[in-house]
């Protein structure tokens, strides 16, 4: 059975050495003078099995490994972004992943996010415990780790420190996340235990071990998945859309199954459904020593087979989206391919809610990953699309906010904000969160929701009628009615302009028209302990239905009293709580209803 190269993706936290490790893997060769070694594809690097065998010859005998895969195809762009963007039906495009962890720092938020994404996509992975050279006292040198891991080459203190860091910073965290894990040389059952391979992207130590372990695991457990369909048409995923001088818009893609030929038809997903376009050229990069003229970087291929990276030149590619599924087929297979691609596009469709926020991302896979992480924190999503932020998006978000301020948000993952959208945001109440790291965007979303809920709570409290008790001061009646003017003391709560007043027997007296301070300046409210002159408009006639030393209450409608009592009691000051309690007791007595306000 013919096997294709396993597709390998590299994930991990920022600054834990993903790019350095990838660079080290890509530069793998037997000697500096050896030509080639690594074949550079579009968007990926192929490490031939012969190169792996040569750099790992001492290990293959040790592990009794007989590698039959043609090599490894390592995706050039590290990180979650690339991993989530590169999807195919049934999960991730990558067959297997390398999770990079700084063995001196341990797990970080993005490490955990990477593991969650790998679990979600059911992608097997090994752990590269990087920065081995920074373990105190460790004598790190290029070559296999396993041949350097002994007391002949390492000081006993360095060996002890290594074991502590390996366990405390890597294995223990994996255990806490529900994985059995161990140093790769101690793993007895690879179906149950995660292999941890110590490496140094700086010195190159452990790179041969890493290549052997990942090749062996891929061959052993993914054989059916790696079976090459030598007769079938090509299946792949769009990496990105690129403008190339002399070619116009081109697609960079990873082909994971089948064979493609020049003159075949490209069938690819786009926002309108499916695009069909006749292929003008299938292009591969020239070797570095051929790249003398940057305008002449590519060479045409009559035929390509999986797994490979390829640049596709064809007409009408403007609306193709990164992460879209594609097929390359002869004319008589176009309809079958269209049905397949449509089905895959529909599987990427994100279920939306009746109300919620807008999310935008640069690729279908990224959009799906962002939506999944937001769902975990109970976010409601009204609209989820691939593409730049437009003025229309902002107008829609503004209309969503009119019914619920928590809906007035756009989250943008790795997309541009068009100039007219920026202008619209500046004059609207819409919040925009932008970023390139999903977990940070989710954290920012949670912080924004918390702030908005506090603001909304504050606004709602301010709209409610606040409880207060006041006493009419003796010798301070200045006018009996229309409006009545007198001096009062605020006993409990806050007296505000517009507050409705009632007597102790429940009679409506009117509402507070004006409050003045001691300098006779108008003020909006008087707090507990203040003595102020007030004017009261309504039924009140001082000396008849309200007299000196009488206690008056701000009349709080029952639904508002209930809200204050149940939802906002903790937000009230002590004197406001007292005013509310006394008012509710009075109303329960007047209404002969012990449940009033409860």
Swiss-Prot record:
Membrane-spanning ranges: none
Keywords: GTP-binding, Initiation factor, Nucleotide-binding, Protein biosynthesis
Residue numbers spanned by region G5: 200-202
Residue ranges, annotated region (G1): 12-19
Location of the region described as G2 in the Swiss-Prot/TrEMBL record: 37-41
Annotated spans, G3: 76-79
CDD domains, alphabetized: aeIF5B_II, IF2_aeIF5B_IV, IF2_eIF5B
GO cellular component terms attached to this protein's record: cytoplasm
UniProt GO molecular function: GTP binding; GTPase activity; translation initiation factor activity
Pfam families: GTP_EFTU, GTP_EFTU_D4, IF-2
Record-linked InterPro entries: EFTU-type, P-loop_NTPase, Small_GTP-bd, T_Tr_GTP-bd_dom, TF_aIF-2_arc, TIF_IF2, TIF_IF2_dom3, TIF_IF2_dom3_sf
Residues involved in GTP binding: 12-19, 76-80, 130-133
Region (G4): 130-133
Residue ranges of domain tr-type G in the record: 3-225
Superkingdom of origin: Archaea
Protein's job: Function in general translation initiation by promoting the binding of the formylmethionine-tRNA to ribosomes. Seems to function along with eIF-2.
Family listed: Belongs to the TRAFAC class translation factor GTPase superfamily. Classic translation factor GTPase family. IF-2 subfamily.
Protein name listed in UniProt: Probable translation initiation factor IF-2
């Amino acid at each position: 059975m013919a096997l294709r190269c396993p597709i390998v993706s590299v994930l991990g936290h920022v600054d834990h050495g993903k790019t350095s490790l990838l660079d080290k893997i890509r530069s793998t060769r037997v000697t500096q003078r050896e030509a080639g070694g690594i074949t550079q594809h579009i968007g990926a690097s192929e490490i031939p099995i012969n190169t792996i065998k040569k750099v790992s010859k001492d290990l293959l005998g040790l592990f009794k490994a007989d590698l039959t895969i043609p090599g490894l195809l390592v995706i050039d762009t590290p990180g979650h972004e690339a991993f989530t963007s590169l999807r195919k039906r049934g999960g991730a495009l990558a067959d297997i992943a390398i999770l990079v962890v700084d063995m001196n720092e341990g797990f970080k938020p993005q490490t955990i996010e990477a593991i969650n994404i790998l679990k979600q996509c059911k992608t097997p992975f090994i752990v590269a415990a990087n920065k081995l050279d920074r373990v105190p006292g460790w004598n790190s040198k290029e070559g296999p780790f396993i041949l350097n891991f002994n007391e002949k080459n390492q000081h006993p203190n360095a060996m002890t420190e290594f074991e502590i860091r390996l366990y405390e910073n890597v294995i223990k965290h994996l255990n806490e996340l529900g994985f059995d894990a161990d140093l790769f040389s101690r793993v007895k059952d690879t179906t149950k235990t995660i292999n941890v391979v110590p490496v140094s992207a700086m010195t190159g130590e452990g790179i041969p071990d890493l290549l052997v372990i990942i090749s062996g695991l891929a061959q052993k457990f993914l054989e059916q998945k790696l079976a090459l369909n030598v007769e079938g048409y090509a299946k792949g995923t769009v990496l990105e859309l690129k403008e190339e001088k002399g070619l116009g818009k081109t697609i960079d893609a990873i082909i994971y199954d089948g064979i493609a030929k020049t003159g075949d038809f490209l069938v690819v997903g786009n926002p309108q459904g499916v695009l069909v376009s006749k292929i003008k050229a299938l292009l591969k990069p020239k070797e570095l020593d051929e790249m003398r003229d940057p305008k002449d970087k590519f060479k045409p291929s009559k035929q390509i087979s999986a797994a490979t990276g390829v640049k596709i030149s064809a007409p009408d590619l403007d609306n193709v989206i990164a992460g879209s599924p594609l097929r390359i087929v002869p004319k008589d297979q176009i309809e079958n391919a269209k049905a397949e691609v449509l089905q895959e596009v529909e599987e990427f469709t994100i279920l939306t809610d009746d109300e919620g926020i807008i999310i935008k991302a640069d690729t279908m896979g990224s959009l799906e990953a962002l939506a999944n992480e937001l769902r975990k924190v109970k976010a409601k999503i009204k609209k989820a699309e691939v593409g730049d932020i437009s003025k229309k998006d902002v107008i829609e978000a503004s209309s969503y906010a009119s019914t619920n301020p928590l809906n007035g948000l756009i989250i943008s993952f790795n997309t541009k904000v068009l100039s007219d959208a920026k202008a619209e945001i500046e004059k609207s109440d819409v919040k925009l969160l932008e970023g390139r790291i999903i977990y940070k965007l989710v954290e920012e979303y949670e912080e924004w929701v918390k702030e908005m809920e506090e603001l909304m709570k504050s606004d709602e409290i301010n709209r409610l009628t606040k409880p207060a008790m006041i006493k009419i001061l003796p010798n301070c009646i200045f006018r009996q009615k229309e409006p009545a003017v007198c001096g009062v003391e605020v006993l409990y709560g806050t007296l505000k302009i517009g507050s409705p007043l009632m007597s102790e027997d429940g009679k409506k007296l009117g509402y507070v028209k004006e409050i003045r301070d001691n300098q006779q300046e108008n003020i909006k409210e008087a707090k507990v302990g203040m003595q102020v002159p007030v004017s009261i408009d309504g039924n009140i006639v001082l000396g008849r239905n309200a007299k000196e030393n009488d206690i008056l209450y701000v009349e709080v409608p029952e639904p508002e009293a209930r809200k204050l009592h149940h939802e906002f009691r903790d937000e009230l000051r002590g004197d406001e709580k007292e005013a509310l309690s006394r008012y509710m007791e009075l109303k329960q007595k007047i209404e002969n209803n012990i449940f009033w306000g409860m």
